[in-house]
Amino acid sequence: MIFDRRRYGKDNYTYLLAAGGDAALVDPGDPDAALALAAAHGVRPRWILHTHGHADHTGGTAAVARALGAQVLGHGGDAARYRPDVDLAGRAEVALGALALRVHPVPGHTPGSVLLEWEGRLLTGDTLFWAGCGNCRHGGDPARLAESFLGPIARLDGGLEVHPGHDYAAPNLAFALALEPDGAAARARLAEVEAAHAAGLEPAPSTLAGERAVNPFLRLDAPGVAAAVARAEPSAAAAGPARRFVALRALRDRA
């Protein structure tokens, strides 16, 4: 079994999954990076999966699909941005040879955003970041993102490893600590991330349980987070969690 990632651009990740002679690439935004990742492991992926349709995640898809003869899978909710060969809408699971993945629709960052679960790992695209969540400035809807966080994401097992589409961990953790200055878990995670960056390494993945200890968007009821939302938008303080989530996302947009 192979699970690996490669950074491209400033902070994007593409991922490789392989088992039993079958392999897939996830979010090959840069064709050279994606093909090099597959070549480094001596595999020829037959499938390309997308967490969502933004160009920094799909920009290399056509070239990689041509080079490998690979089939492209993605959620039809983002069909205005790209056209997958196989629509994941309505599919809770997908079997790709020896690879069996669970598909969790999480609209918000884009209409067709999904989380891909494989062997205890959760590929979260731009929906759930380490210590943060994706913005909704490019075709998204913060109210729908709130529903995804409060519904399907809240129900997922805490032991799942979180593998996002970008490494925004340091600025996200700085924002989290601005809301909760005494957050020991966030401070420890930031030190870990900064040490990895200083050594030229990639940060270790977190888990959903770890995210629930540091990520403000999973901590709406924490006193520091609730107080920050109340200061920024007093009318949201007494509202339900979805309204507080939207207010927190707006606060993060201004940070």
Curated annotation (Swiss-Prot):
GO biological process, one term: antibiotic catabolic process
Cofactor, free-text remark: Binds 2 Zn(2+) ions per subunit.
Positions that bind Zn(2+) 2: 56-57, 126, 166
Pathway given in the UniProt record: Secondary metabolite metabolism; methylglyoxal degradation; (R)-lactate from methylglyoxal: step 2/2
Catalytic reactions on record: an S-(2-hydroxyacyl)glutathione + H2O = a 2-hydroxy carboxylate + glutathione + H(+)
A Pfam family hit: HAGH_C
Subunit details: Monomer.
Protein's name according to its UniProt entry: Hydroxyacylglutathione hydrolase
Organism: Anaeromyxobacter dehalogenans (strain 2CP-C)
Lineage of source species: Bacteria, Pseudomonadati, Myxococcota, Myxococcia, Myxococcales
